[in-house]
Amino acid sequence: MLRLEHVSKSFHAGADRVVAVRETDLRLARGDFLTIIGSNGAGKSTLLNLIAGLYPPTSGKIVLGGADVTSVSAHRRARHVGRIVQDPLAGTAPSMTVAENLALAMSRGRRSLRPALSRRLHSRFREQLAALDIGLEDRLRCQVALLSGGERQALAVLMATLVPPEVLLLDEHTAALDPSNATMIVQLTRSFVRRLDLTTLMVTHNMEQAIASGTRLIMMHKGQILAELCGDEKAQATVPELVDLFTRYHVVDDELLLERVL
């Protein structure tokens, strides 16, 4: 389903050169759910951006669904890649209505801006929003900017999966939310991933989320994958064991340390 072969990404040149991702190999089968942890600047978000096509790799190859997409633009790749980022506003069009945002999501990766908002389409959107169980079905004509952060992120989850993608990328998509909304979004995300059998990569600093979500877990540092947990090893992992893993590799995660203090 998704394969990265010796993928590297560098920024700048000469003395200012920064290697964000270094000779990374990764394979995910359909339905795999990979959680990614690591220190700040470890290359986690860069890895997701490379898969989304936002950056071209400096070297290496990216294969999606059997096709080499290394040189395919982010716009064309958007037909196959769903993406949810940290900022609830960034994943939506705040000045447009909920219905217009969903119509845009249906046109992801196509030439047309959005399909006509017919009564039939409104009815379909209402049913899909009602399934979220947070009251958005009554706010189809509401501007997204007027929604709460949790509501916007729930909408972003629906938009990213409205046309089921081959790969779903979650880049700290609960980090800007309060604990209650973060829990709601994680549960909602798992529900969509499970029901649609989506191949998923999730970046998070939340160790409990990393353990509870997904089938595999990797730890990154300085652009490299240092460790991987899967199967029973991941299912039985605990937060202290993940902290010990950071310590073993001399990795410092400031956000993790803050969580432990609080």
Regions found by a protein language model. Give the residues of each.
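Helix-to-loop junction immediately C-terminal to a conserved catalytic motif
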Residues: A52
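Conserved ABC transporter NBD signature motif
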Residues: G60-A67, A227-L229
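ABC ATPase NBD coupling module
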Residues: A15, D68-G82, A90, S112-S118, ...
